[in-house]
């Protein structure tokens, strides 16, 4: 709604139009089985159906994909039940994001949201790109932390070459994920196409993610600062440039360092910590 943030009385709130509702981003950083996201899906879908009705009452045309479009497109069905199903699918695919450290919880969340969308004729897996596994409290939350290799970047340092290359990779991933986000899903072929787009975006970010992992690992292992960390980051700056330039041997070395750094103070039988880098996992949001 337009109004709550401005302190407007409830009776004067105005529902946002469909494009703005579909551009919302709702994230649960510890989603477990997805209960919060399921309720968010239901509530927002009801608001979207309401917004469609208001748009039509104002003389606009709503297409089958939920967009307010020109009148020559296929029309959205009029019955409320069908509209609710379409709205839930659109909200689930375009607006909901979730993270959990437990891989099983991630799969349960996918199943929970799939069930609430009533997408019984739709293949399972269409939320793979938005529901991810990792430690939402461990990782970078701003891209410049990675491009400057600093947890507190000033913005005044000249961007290194590897930093510019990382930014380029992120921009390419955003373009791919934007195509994925706008893609309608009707059958298994659409899901496969989405999976290919997501995999392509992940490949673009493979090296930046490895650099982010070792960066966070070294920060974690050093306790967050000190001369030891400074020396390690100087070394990482050189290795990051080599890895971005395609040196697979350096990249493999960095990945071995990651496991050691992210296993600091863990029992020997425990797997290494699993950072979650928000600007790389959800680049179109961050």
Task: Name what the model sees in each region.
Residues 1-25, 82-89, 115, 119, ...:
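Flexible, glycine/threonine-enriched loop-and-boundary segments that flank and lead into catalytic domains
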Residues 1-84, 105, 260, 272:
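Class I S-adenosyl-L-methionine
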Residues 2, 41-56, 101, 114-119, ...:
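Hydrophobic/aromatic-lined pockets within catalytic cores
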Residues 28, 97-99:
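Conserved SAM-binding motif I beta-strand of class I
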Residues 32, 94-96:
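Catalytic palm active-site di-aspartate
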Residues 38, 45, 101-172, 276-286:
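Signature of N6-adenine DNA methyltransferases within the class I
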Residues 91-92, 126:
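Short, solvent-exposed loop/turn segments at the edges of secondary structure
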Residues 139-280:
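Basic, amphipathic N-terminal segments
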């Amino acid at each position: 709604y337009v109004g709550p943030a401005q302190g407007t009385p409830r009776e004067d709130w105005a529902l946002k139009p469909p494009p703005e509702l579909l551009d919302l981003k709702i994230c649960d950083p510890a989603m477990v089985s997805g209960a919060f996201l399921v309720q968010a899906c239901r509530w927002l879908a009801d608001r979207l159906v309401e917004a469609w009705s208001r748009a039509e009452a104002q003389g606009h045309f709503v297409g089958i994909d939920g967009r307010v479009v020109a009148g020559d497109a296929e029309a959205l069905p009029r019955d409320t039940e069908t509209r609710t199903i379409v709205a839930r699918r659109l909200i689930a695919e375009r607006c909901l994001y979730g993270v959990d450290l437990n891989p099983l919880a991630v799969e349960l969340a996918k199943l929970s949201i799939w069930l609430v969308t009533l997408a019984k004729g739709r293949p399972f897996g269409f939320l793979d790109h938005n529901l991810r596994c990792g430690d939402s409290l461990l990782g970078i939350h701003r891209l410049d932390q990675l491009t400057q290799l600093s947890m507190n970047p000033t913005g005044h340092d000249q961007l290194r070459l590897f930093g510019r290359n990382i930014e380029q990779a992120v921009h390419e991933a955003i373009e791919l994920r934007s195509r994925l986000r706008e893609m309608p899903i009707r059958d298994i072929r659409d899901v496969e196409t989405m999976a290919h787009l997501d995999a392509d975006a992940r490949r673009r970010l493979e090296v930046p993610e490895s650099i982010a992992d070792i960066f966070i690992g070294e920060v974690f292992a050093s306790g967050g600062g000190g001369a030891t960390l400074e020396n390690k980051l100087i070394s990482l700056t050189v290795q990051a440039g080599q890895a971005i330039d395609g040196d697979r041997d350096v990249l493999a070395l960095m990945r071995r360092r990651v496991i050691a750094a992210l296993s600091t103070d863990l029992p020997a039988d425990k797997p290494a910590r699993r950072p979650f880098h928000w600007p790389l996992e959800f680049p179109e949001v961050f």
